Structure formats: structure tokens, C-alpha cells
């Protein structure tokens, strides 16, 4: 028989025997701890720190308008700086073509068309055959000479600004190359390295460092170690004391955050800013070597330094990149831009332009500086020359008030068009967009030699309609001076009126 038939059915397997627990180095392993129930499984929440609080940045048109308004002026000043470096301040267009990269021109543009867009600043003259040169107009040259004279006359103020900048640094020493980034913003003379830095050894001296020459402070003046915020606080206290003496039974004043007009913050953001303001003020001229990086006290000191630097500038604004060059001297954090954005009650960061700009909020009112010095007034005159149109508009026919109103509407319309935002073409830089707008999108290869240099294919048409305008004016004058015409027959007899 088959062996399979002799097996019992159903087959019940024998019970498996378990092996004894193995020991690890002679001792049993402890059982893993059981996790706590779900309600008790809470992650530790870090303590709230004011310095790390995030504040959402919000666009503000008045400050962005300042950047947009200086868009053309920035290009013109670049052209002027290249021109004044030439002998007799005259330059050929062929030589100007070598500075395309400095002007921010990544594509070929018509330089002749670009220069003729600013007739109030540049004069394009012909010298010889196919030789074009350009120079400053008499009005633009006068403004340039006035600016040089004013910068040289204000040398004492420039020395005080350099001393205050050195007094705020940690080692009381700053590389001259870094100071040069703030040269125009502080109103320093063009050649301050060879003039201001060497003429006042009683205040600072030039020392040789591994990374280049540096400016080192030699005399500490306690009278200069007073920040603009402290002076403003003293004036505010004096004003409140006068009001307290004049007003009787005045209600108690509560500590509250006075936000600028138009600035909208959430309740949490306003609470964090209020807590930061209640912290004791740390002077930017005080010793900050003991302050720990990332702490609230260090950020309070950093905000004071940025506030003081912006107070020293001519227009109370500068580029954020210029401030980042001083990370080592002032121990700024790596996220300096984020730190400035976290305090919208003091600063405003504009993303308009190729590089971000930071404004001192208290120094502006509706996109205008509250206090303007002579350099700012000269810049406004230069902006007026830049705005001079190439082809003046024809005078409007009508009364003086109507013509004035029409010109005013045209001017306001041009101002609005210049100030409107153009965020669509993000691929090109702002300077490239401006050149494209001014030159009509044409390159140097688009024009021909000869008449194309002067005509540019956009000359104004001849005034064929002048006679019609004169006739219309005569008819209008005749009807206005005399009485209403009397209807008559062809033979002269008067007709009956209806």
C-alpha cells in the first residue's frame, strides 16, 4: 500500500516550541518606552522673539514713485559722468560706444537717438565728415559747475559725516573702498580720497591694510556722538513740556505706536513693533562688542545705525547693497534686508529699479523730502532739464487760461505716464527698458549714414496748417469785436428777422 494512506486524517501539526530569549552581554535589553497618549504629545514651542518676528512687506506708491521719477535722471547722470571725464568735456559718439556696458546697454541701441531725447542736457554737433560729437548744454554745464562748487564748499560737513561714520564702526576703521559706495549719497567731493582723507590728520588718517587703504579715526569727539534720533527725541520732549505748561487738566497720554499715514499693520505686527519700541534705546555710537548676535539688543543697535546712516545721506535714502558692504564694521546680520523690512515704522524698502533702495520714512511726506538742501535743489533743476521735450508742443489756440489748463493737463498726463509701474518686462533690466523706450526699439544697424544721423526718421512734419490757424483766429476776433451781423438782401435791403 501507499505510505500516504497510513497517515491519520486530518493531519494536526505538532505545537512549535519557542527558543529561550537570547541575552545581550549577559543582561536583557530594556523594553522601549511606550509613547504618551495623543493629547500629551505636544511639541515644545520656542519662546517668541521680537527680532525674529516676520512682517509682511507692503508696496507704497509714494516711495516707489521716487525711484520711478529718477529713472531717466539716473541714465543722464551716467552719461554726464562719462562726458565730464573727457578733455574739454567733449566726446565723440564712437568713443561713447565703448561705454555701453557701463551704461547698462546689453543690446545695440542708437546712441544718437538716445542723446537727442534730452535736448536740455546734451548738444550733438557735427565736426567733419561723418564725425559727431556731443557736449553739455550751457544750462547743464552751469548746473554741473554749481554742483562741484557746492560739494567743495561743504567740505566741513563732509568731514563731520566721515567722522560720525568712523565713530559708529566697531574698530573705528573702515576701508576707503567701502566708503566710496556712499560717496554720492553722503555728498562727498568726487576726489575725496586725495582731498578730504589727507587734509585732516587731526581727525582721521589713512592706514594700509591687507585689503587696501583704510580710514582710521584719530580723535573722538563726544559732541558728535549724538544721533539724529536722540536730537529729535529732545526736541519732542521740549515741545511736550511747552504744551504741558500751556494746557491745564490735560488727559493722560498712553504709550502707543504712532504709525505713519497709510501704513497698515495687523494687530500682531503692531504689538511686536510696540514691544520693540519699548526696549531701551541703544546709541549707534555706543560700544556694541558685548551684544550677542541675533539678540533683540543687537537688532535695536543695528536699527539705530541704519537710521543714523540714512540721516547722514543727502536724500535720506540709499541702496540696500551699500549697507551690506559694512557688515563687518557694524556687525550687521546676514539678512540685513529682512531686518530692515521688519521695521516698517522706521524704514521702507522699495524693490523698484535694478537694486533695492531703503528710505528713512520720517524724512518723506508724499514722495517729497521734508527738508531739502542745496544739492537736492540742484538735482531737481537737473531733472527739469531732463524733462525738456525734444519738440516743443504747439501753443494752444484760445485764451491764456485755456492754454495753461491744456498744458497743465498734458504735463500731469506725462507725469502719470512716467510714474506708472511697468512690471511686465521682468526679463530686461530697468535701464534696458528705458533705453528701449527712448530709442524706439531701434539699434545702430537700423539707421543709414548721411541724413539718418540728423533726421532719425522722426522729424516733425512741416507746419502746413499755420495759415488755417491764423484765418480761424482772425474770424474769431472779428466776430468777437463787432456786433451780431444783420441779414440783408443781395441789393442791400435789410431782411426781416424771425
Curated annotation (Swiss-Prot):
Organism from which the protein derives: Zea mays
UniProt domain PORR: residue ranges: 59-387
Residue segments, region Disordered: 397-427, 446-498
Molecular function GO terms recorded: mRNA binding; RNA binding
A GO cellular component annotation in the UniProt record: chloroplast
Protein's job: RNA-binding protein involved in the chloroplastic group II intron splicing. Binds specific group II introns and promotes their splicing. Functions in the context of a heterodimer with the ribonuclease III domain-containing protein RNC1.
Stored InterPro entries: PORR_domain (IPR021099), PORR_fam (IPR045040)
Coiled-coil regions, chain positions: none
Transit peptide region: 1-50
UniProt-listed Pfam families: PORR
Subcellular localization: Plastid, Chloroplast
Listed PANTHER family: PROTEIN WHAT'S THIS FACTOR 1 HOMOLOG, CHLOROPLASTIC
GO BP annotations listed: Group II intron splicing; mRNA processing; photosynthesis; RNA splicing
Protein name: Protein WHAT'S THIS FACTOR 1, chloroplastic
Gene disruption phenotype: Seedling lethality.
Keywords for this protein: Chloroplast, mRNA processing, mRNA splicing, Plastid, RNA-binding, Transit peptide
Comp. bias intervals (Acidic residues): 417-427, 456-466
UniProt keyword Plastid present: yes
Amino acid at each position: 500500500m501507499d505510505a500516504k494512506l497510513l497517515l491519520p486524517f486530518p493531519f494536526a501539526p505538532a505545537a512549535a516550541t519557542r527558543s529561550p530569549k537570547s541575552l545581550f552581554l549577559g543582561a536583557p535589553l530594556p523594553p522601549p518606552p511606550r509613547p504618551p497618549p495623543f493629547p500629551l504629545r505636544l511639541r515644545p514651542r520656542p519662546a517668541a522673539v521680537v527680532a525674529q518676528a516676520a512682517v509682511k512687506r507692503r508696496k507704497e506708491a509714494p516711495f516707489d514713485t521716487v525711484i520711478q521719477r529718477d529713472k531717466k535722471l539716473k541714465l543722464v547722470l551716467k552719461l554726464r559722468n562719462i562726458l565730464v571725464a573727457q578733455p574739454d568735456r567733449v566726446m565723440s559718439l564712437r568713443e561713447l560706444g565703448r561705454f555701453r556696458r557701463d551704461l547698462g546697454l546689453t543690446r545695440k541701441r542708437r546712441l544718437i537717438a538716445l542723446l537727442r531725447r534730452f535736448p536740455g542736457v546734451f548738444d550733438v554737433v557735427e565736426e567733419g565728415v561723418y564725425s559727431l560729437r556731443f557736449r553739455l548744454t550751457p544750462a547743464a554745464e552751469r548746473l554741473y559747475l554749481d554742483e562741484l562748487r557746492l560739494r567743495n564748499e561743504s567740505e566741513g560737513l563732509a568731514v563731520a559725516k566721515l567722522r560720525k561714520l568712523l565713530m559708529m564702526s566697531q574698530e573705528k576703521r573702515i576701508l576707503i573702498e567701502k566708503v566710496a559706495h556712499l560717496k554720492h549719497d553722503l555728498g562727498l567731493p568726487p576726489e575725496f580720497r586725495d582731498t578730504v582723507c589727507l587734509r585732516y590728520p587731526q581727525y582721521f588718517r589713512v592706514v594700509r591694510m591687507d585689503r587696501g587703504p583704510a580710514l582710521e579715526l584719530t580723535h573722538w569727539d563726544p559732541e558728535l556722538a549724538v544721533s539724529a534720533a536722540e536730537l529729535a527725541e529732545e526736541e519732542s520732549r521740549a515741545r511736550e513740556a511747552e504744551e504741558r505748561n500751556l494746557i491745564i487738566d490735560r488727559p493722560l497720554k498712553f504709550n502707543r505706536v504712532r504709525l505713519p499715514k497709510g501704513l497698515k499693520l495687523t494687530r500682531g505686527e503692531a504689538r511686536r513693533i510696540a514691544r520693540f519700541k519699548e526696549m531701551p534705546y541703544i546709541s549707534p555710537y555706543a560700544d556694541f562688542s558685548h551684544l550677542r548676535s541675533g539678540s533683540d539688543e543687537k537688532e535695536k543697535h543695528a536699527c539705530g545705525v541704519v537710521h543714523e546712516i540714512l540721516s547722514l545721506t543727502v536724500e535720506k535714502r540709499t541702496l540696500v547693497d551699500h549697507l551690506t558692504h559694512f557688515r563687518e564694521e557694524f556687525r550687521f546680520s546676514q539678512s540685513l534686508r529682512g531686518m530692515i523690512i521688519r521695521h516698517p515704522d522706521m524704514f521702507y524698502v522699495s524693490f523698484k529699479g535694478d537694486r533695492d533702495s531703503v528710505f528713512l520714512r520720517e524724512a518723506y511726506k508724499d514722495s517729497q523730502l521734508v527738508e531739502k538742501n542745496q544739492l537736492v535743489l540742484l538735482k531737481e533743476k537737473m531733472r527739469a532739464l531732463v524733462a525738456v521735450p525734444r519738440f516743443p508742443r504747439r501753443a494752444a489756440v484760445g485764451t491764456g487760461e485755456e492754454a495753461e489748463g491744456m498744458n497743465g493737463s498734458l504735463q500731469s498726463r506725462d507725469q502719470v505716464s512716467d510714474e506708472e509701474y511697468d512690471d511686465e518686462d521682468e526679463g530686461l533690466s530697468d535701464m534696458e527698458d528705458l533705453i528701449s523706450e527712448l530709442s524706439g526699439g531701434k539699434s545702430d544697424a537700423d539707421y543709414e549714414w548721411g541724413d539718418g544721423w540728423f533726421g532719425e526718421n522722426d522729424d516733425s512734419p512741416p507746419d502746413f496748417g499755420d495759415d488755417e490757424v491764423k484765418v480761424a483766429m482772425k474770424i474769431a476776433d472779428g466776430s468777437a469785436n463787432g456786433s451780431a451781423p444783420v441779414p440783408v438782401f443781395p441789393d442791400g435791403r435789410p431782411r426781416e428777422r424771425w
